From Swiss-Prot:
Main subcellular location of this protein, as a coarse class: plastid
Residue stretches spanning the membrane: none
Keyword presence, DNA damage: no
UniProtKB keywords: Plastid, Ribonucleoprotein, Ribosomal protein, RNA-binding, rRNA-binding
GO terms under cellular component: cytosolic large ribosomal subunit; plastid
Protein name, entry field: Large ribosomal subunit protein uL14c
Gene Ontology MF terms in the entry: large ribosomal subunit rRNA binding; structural constituent of ribosome
SUPFAM superfamilies given in the database record: Ribosomal protein L14
Localization per record: Plastid
Pfam family, one: Ribosomal_L14
SMART domains xrefs: Ribosomal_L14
Record's keyword annotation contains DNA-binding: no
Quaternary context: Part of the 50S ribosomal subunit.
Length: 122
């Protein structure tokens, strides 16, 4: 579950390494955000010479959480890190490549543009 002040890894090639959640925009509950939810975040760490600058305010979609994901078929899924993908206001990814697995809960949330870039879907 992602809430304000949570540090997330960035799972795309925009140049940002870490972001910190400021606000949950479209969440599944009042408490926090889960996989497929949209957040507003600030960039904390970047790579050198990137399009995204440090302390820039961005929107992101959560793609991996350390909190367990419970599926209807009885399967439980848990990742080692909290990760997000930077998106535009129209929910299109800013990067051209994604890293790591993407759960299919993102496609259920209507984020097909992110699913199309995913290397593999769990």
């Amino acid at each position: 579950m992602i809430q304000a002040q949570t540090i997330l890894q960035v799972a795309d090639n925009t140049g940002a390494k870490e972001i910190m959640c400021i606000r949950v925009l479209r969440g599944s509950s009042k408490k926090g955000a889960r996989v497929g939810d949209i957040i507003v975040a600030v960039v904390k760490k970047t790579k050198k010479q990137t399009s995204v600058k440090k302390s820039e305010i961005v929107r992101a979609v959560i793609v991996r959480t350390r909190t367990t994901i419970h599926r209807a078929n009885g399967m439980h899924l848990k990742f080692n890190e909290n990760a997000a993908v930077l998106v535009t206001k129209e929910l299109h990814p800013k990067g051209t490549r994604l890293f790591g697995p993407i759960p299919y809960e993102c496609s259920e949330a209507g984020l097909n543009s992110i699913i199309s870039l995913a290397p593999y879907i769990i």
